[in-house]
Amino acid sequence: MTNKKFILNADDFGMSQDYNRAVLVGYEDGFLRSASICANGPSFESAINEILPECQELSLGVHLNIIEGKSLTHCPLLTDEKGNFNNGYLAMILKSNNREFLSQTEKEFRAQIERVQAVAKPDHIDSHVHVHAIPPIFKLVCRLAKEYKIPYVRTQNEILYAVDNKKKTCTLAYGVNIIKNLLLKFFTMQNKKLLPQYGIKTNDYLIGVCYTAMMNSQTLEEGLKAIEGDNIITECLIHPKNYAIKKDDHHAEEFKLSRDKLLQDTIYRLGFEISNHKNL
């Protein structure tokens, strides 16, 4: 008997009303059962007060963000003089062994976790642009997860796969994503060794890096088909938006994915149970 769990997670909850509406409708009309909220998001209060009460069984995560928007604390190594985050991913890697940088990062992460815990009970942690995958930052996040009793931290082990769609695969963006995927897999090999020390759960596989900004029902289905084995947890990250004024972009496509009944049937047919972090 197989025990394959699949989690569809909406990142960037609280970043805008478009993201918030997508979580609500994806939960009510689709198979979205998990979302990660940005504590510094412009629509954080709306997400907490208007969306979460309508999604009683939604698994809520903390989407740690030191990449975009304003900080909750004074952390000058992470922000400009106006308090806006101003480090890219490479800068984060280069600074990640700097003691003061890690101290300021910890202070900001604590503020973000505590803001979410003040109004909800988060059960997982991930981050904006996978910044927590950088090994020194990952170790910090595991320590905080244990302290704040958050049992699950995302890792980034995505199997390299390609869909039969030249518009997606034969592109510069896909090539860049492959490089990003290889870097994240390298980090994950190191990071997973820390998990037993902190008693943290994680996913076995991730879908959503190779086709960042290109996710749809086809890319998710092919990603699941590339995964073999039983007793596994597979997480797929999406960035869905339910626009007030219609747009056709990858955010809208990912919103559509979360409500695709044929895709939902395919997930079951492939032997996966649709779950969320709180039910692991």
What residue ranges belong to the model's regions?
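Gly/Ser/Thr-rich loops at beta-strand to alpha-helix junctions
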Residues: 130-134
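Terminal accessory/targeting
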Residues: 1-7, 17-59, 63-120, 124, ...
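DG-centered beta-turn motif at the end of beta-strands
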Residues: 10-14
